[in-house]
Amino acid sequence: MKKLFSLLFLTLMTLPIMAQKNVYKFSVKDGNEHTVKLKDYKGKVLLIVNTATKCGFTPQYETLQKLYETYKNQGLVILDFPCNQFGAQAPGSFRDIHTFCTGNYGTTFPQFAKINVNGRNESPLYTYLKAQQPFKGFDMNNNIGKFLDEKFRAENPDYAKDPSIKWNFTKFLIDRQGHVIDRFEPTADMKDVEAGIKAALKMK
């Protein structure tokens, strides 16, 4: 009974978030803890990414920066949200993380304060993103995808039905109207991510 009431409470709490029609009602904190309203990005194509500096996927920063440089003049903005929930792979302060990313990968896209993307203290933005685009499955054509699938399946055979963020560098693609139009798991080919970005940039 107690679990039922807890589930009901969480459902009621998230209903206003689920009812949102786009990402523009949400606000986030930048590295200096200043509020940034996502409505400031109206008309842009957004790629929202939860990141980490000590992860096997961290080199994706290089590709993300190249994508940003290639498409920013067409309207692409990449929003970087460091998250320490997966293997504690985003340690340190915002300054530590920002210095690492700019020094090692030359990143110039916006980077925000560290957040949680799952659980009781998750960012409301991520509650919304996950509700709009569920888990898409790992790429089973590479060894990392197979490893992650085995890892999560051992913990929960039905893990794929859970929309939660599974690991660092999960990406959500937002169109120019603020709608969440796609999700890319960390094992997704970055060429597919680029193709999604190009298609979104062509949309009116």
Enumerate the predicted regions with their spans.
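Bacterial Sec-dependent N-terminal signal peptides
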Residues: 1-21
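N-terminal "domain-start" segment that seeds a small globular fold
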Residues: 18-39
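Amphipathic alpha-helical repeat scaffolds
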Residues: 30, 50-54
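Conserved helix-turn-beta segment immediately C-terminal to the redox Cys motif
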Residues: 44-45, 53-54, 58-82, 101-105
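Thiol-based oxidoreductase modules, predominantly thioredoxin-like and allied folds used
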Residues: 75-92, 108-119
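Thiol/selenol-based redox catalytic cores and closely related redox-interacting motifs
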Residues: 106-186
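Non-catalytic, surface beta->alpha helical segment in thiol-disulfide oxidoreductase systems
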Residues: 182-203
